Amino acid sequence: MEKINENIFHQYNKWKQGYSRKENSFKQRVQNFLSNREDADIYSISKDSKYLNAYYNVVIHDEDIRDGKLPVPFGEIRGDFECSRCDSLISLEGAPKRVDRKFECYNCPSLTSLEGAPKEVGWLFSCKRCTSLTSLVGAPEESRDFFDCSSCDSLISLEGAPKKVGKNFNCSKCKNLLSLEGAPKELGGAFDCSDCENLTSLVGVPKKIHGYFDCSGCENLTSLEYLPKEIAGDLYIGKRFKGKIPEDVIVKGVIQYE
């Protein structure tokens, strides 16, 4: 019995020491991050001492990145959060849990996944021109404003995209995108999938578009069979589809043959 109690006591002390080291490590990382920042006064540490919060805009530069990750784990951001143009960023581990306005991680050529991205974003979410991004899994389930994943050369599917987007959804110029399945089911604005040269079908697009719909420049698109049933704005399609729009499709704007 004494041996068991000794083991429990030993394990407790070991855990306590480990927890203390982790806590000190977090504080050291925060100190290192804030030491050369002129905006250090906008930050605060969460009550559980696990996250760094901010009540204004946060901009992360490539020199802030540590081992391919964000410098500290962030919690709630009361403004914008940007970690764009960070060539060495590999992972969004440590990204904020919530961003009140914009979250931008565009032009990060080494980023391969959105795992770790905020679950709540108030305005825009942009991961455009992340040329190594292979999946949208990890993106927030809802983007209240715009969602932009355009020019992501390695993206082959929209699986993982938000289920609901308040305004526009842009997946244009994704040259290896093979399918639109996984696209938002609810959309409050335009849908742009133009210049996706390997796209062969419109399967997966929302049935109703509240802005323009652009599928021009998709040279391998073979059919307009799954075109949205109602388009509130203009429709942009290739010249080869002139006169081939399904009769049950309502376009309230102008049909533009690109």
Language-model features: where?
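Leucine-rich repeat
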Residues: 46-49, 69-73, 92-94, 115-116, ...
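Helix-centric, low-specificity signal for extended rod-like, repetitive segments
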Residues: 9, 20-22, 90, 112, ...
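Concave beta-strand-loop units of leucine-rich repeat
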Residues: 54-66, 77-88, 96-110, 118-132, ...
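N-terminal capping/linker segments that flank leucine-rich repeat
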Residues: 1-82, 242-258
